[in-house]
């Protein structure tokens, strides 16, 4: 019987254990940041342990990093977390992409950009959006702090193999519709728990035609569909992305092995979902989880249960309204979902020559120093600033209410991030998840508009 892509990568990393029981996996790459690593390092100290593989452990600073003045951290807790990681990196011999360094940025952007993320690897990080790296044909998943310590000490982790769910996506994306709309549509249609217990393999002609940036967007939000893992078969687009990057010096001798990473024709999936995107519309969330979304042209749904009622109350909206009725106050272009160069380029096409609506505070936060530099070479910073956007330093920023970048209470924000939970962007903040193009158009018009009519 054939194997799925996920099965092949998983089986190559099993050190001990039987199928159906917890198995001990070897971990090829451990990415860490300032929030979920301090207690894990302290655990090593208390047990007088060393880091098992410091050469496979890489750190960056992202969650608490200020995006205006990166060297002036006013919050005491944030400053302590950042300085603690800097010290731990020195004490344990970990390579750190430090504040202001050329490669610093959101952890799920730093891995791919530096060439650390590669096909066939097992990758973990103390962050739920680690599935992003699955876009390269890797098994990548988020872990908790106790598991971070376990990987520190042993370079292994006990895991139970999930079932396989194939999501076959075909059709040509209409103008003004993007990878973000695909994953939001899937979650809206099948729910925030449809992927629970599964590894999601995204396949089909639509996926094959996506750039790596688009593929990462889709895998990034696998967790919002309840799945711990998202994975895509590596191909020439993948290999071209990895080639020549700083930590990809093994490329020439590895690429032939990477070409073996695919699901066999006779591989059996536990479940299959099929999607034709040829008539897909731009997506907008109206509620307080990513499942609560609509096509742009559709009204918000009727109230079906207490969760819907609570969401409408929190968001200050009513059934029957449409996205264009939302009174927006903020626009956020950023996060590990949509702060890559192609995202900023797409948004800049809409912004160029226009001005941010007077009722809107618009912020652009490149996901990494690499993206920021490349964007500035293309003059994107000038386009955004001339329009009235704030052009910030890289970091997680307004994706979560953990740093100075927060949406005021009661204000609606068009956001390119991945979560719209209550308080996610700050106490009382009202988040609407959209693509970068939709967010850019909203900034100019002061409300949500059909981006298909304005994209150039």
Curated annotation (Swiss-Prot):
User: Any idea which positions bind [4Fe-4S] cluster?
Assistant: 336, 396, 399
Q: What is this protein called?
A: 3-isopropylmalate dehydratase large subunit
Its quaternary organisation is:
Heterodimer of LeuC and LeuD.
What Pfam families has UniProt attached to this entry? Aconitase (PF00330)
Query: What keywords sit in the KW lines?
Result: 4Fe-4S, Amino-acid biosynthesis, Branched-chain amino acid biosynthesis, Iron, Iron-sulfur, Leucine biosynthesis, Lyase, Metal-binding
Q: In which pathway does it act?
A: Amino-acid biosynthesis; L-leucine biosynthesis; L-leucine from 3-methyl-2-oxobutanoate: step 2/4
> What's this protein's family per the entry?
Belongs to the aconitase/IPM isomerase family. LeuC type 1 subfamily.
Q: Which cofactor does it need?
A: [4Fe-4S] cluster
Q: What class of enzyme is it?
A: lyase
Q: Which reaction does it catalyse?
A: (2R,3S)-3-isopropylmalate = (2S)-2-isopropylmalate
Gene for this chain: leuC
Species whose genome carries this gene: Staphylococcus aureus (strain NCTC 8325 / PS 47)
The record's listing under InterPro entries reads:
3-IsopropMal_deHydase_lsu, Acnase/IPM_dHydase_lsu_aba_1/3, Acoase/IPM_deHydtase_lsu_aba, Aconitase_4Fe-4S_BS, Aconitase_4Fe-4S_dom, IPM_dehydratase_rel_enz, IPMI_cat
Q: Does Lyase show up as a keyword for this record? A: yes
Enzyme Commission code: 4.2.1.33
What task does this protein carry out?
A: Catalyzes the isomerization between 2-isopropylmalate and 3-isopropylmalate, via the formation of 2-isopropylmaleate.
Its BP terms in the Gene Ontology are: L-leucine biosynthetic process
GO MF entries:
3-isopropylmalate dehydratase activity; 4 iron, 4 sulfur cluster binding; metal ion binding
Cofactor binding comment, as recorded? Binds 1 [4Fe-4S] cluster per subunit.
């Amino acid at each position: 019987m054939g194997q799925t892509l996920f099965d092949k990568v998983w089986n190559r990393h099993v050190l001990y254990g039987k199928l159906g029981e917890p198995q001990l996996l070897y971990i090829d790459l451990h990415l860490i940041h300032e929030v979920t690593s301090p207690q894990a390092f302290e655990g090593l100290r208390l047990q007088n342990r060393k880091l098992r593989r410091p050469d496979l452990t890489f750190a960056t600073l992202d969650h608490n990093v200020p995006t205006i003045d990166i060297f002036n951290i006013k919050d005491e807790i944030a400053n302590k977390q950042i300085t603690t990681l800097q010290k731990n990196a020195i004490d344990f011999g970990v390579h750190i992409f430090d504040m202001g360094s050329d490669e610093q940025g959101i952890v799920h952007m730093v891995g791919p950009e530096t060439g650390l993320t590669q096909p066939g690897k097992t990758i973990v990080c103390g962050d739920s959006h680690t599935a992003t790296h699955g876009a390269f044909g890797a098994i990548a998943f988020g872990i908790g702090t106790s598991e971070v310590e376990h990987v520190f000490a042993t370079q292994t982790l006990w895991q139970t193999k999930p079932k396989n769910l194939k999501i076959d996506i075909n059709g040509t994306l209409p103008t003004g519709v993007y990878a973000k709309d695909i994953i939001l549509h899937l979650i809206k249609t099948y729910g925030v728990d449809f992927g629970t217990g599964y590894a999601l393999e995204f396949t089909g002609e639509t996926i094959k035609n996506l750039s790596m940036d688009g593929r990462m967007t889709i895998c990034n939000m696998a967790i919002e569909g309840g799945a711990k893992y998202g994975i895509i078969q590596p191909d020439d687009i993948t290999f071209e992305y990895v080639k020549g990057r700083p930590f990809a010096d093994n490329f020439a001798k590895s690429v032939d092995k990477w070409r073996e990473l695919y699901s066999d024709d006779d591989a059996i999936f536990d479940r299959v979902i099929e999607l034709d995107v040829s008539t897909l519309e731009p997506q907008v969330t109206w509620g307080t989880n990513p499942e609560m979304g609509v096509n742009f042209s559709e009204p918000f749904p009727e109230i079906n249960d207490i969760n819907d009622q609570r969401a409408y109350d929190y968001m200050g909206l009513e059934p029957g309204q449409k996205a264009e009725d939302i009174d927006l106050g903020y626009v956020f272009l950023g996060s590990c979902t949509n702060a890559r160069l192609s995202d900023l380029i797409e948004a800049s096409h809409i912004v160029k020559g226009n001005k941010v609506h007077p009722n809107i505070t618009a912020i652009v936060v490149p996901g990494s120093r690499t993206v920021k530099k490349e964007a500035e070479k293309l003059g994107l910073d000038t386009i955004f600033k001339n329009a009235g956007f704030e052009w910030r330093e890289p970091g997680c920023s307004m994706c979560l209410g953990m740093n100075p970048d927060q949406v005021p209470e009661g204000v609606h924000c068009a956001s390119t991030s991945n979560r719209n939970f209550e308080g996610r962007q700050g106490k009382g903040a009202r988040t609407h998840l959209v693509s970068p193009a939709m967010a850019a158009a909203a900034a100019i018009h002061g409300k949500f508009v059909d981006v298909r009519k304005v994209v150039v």
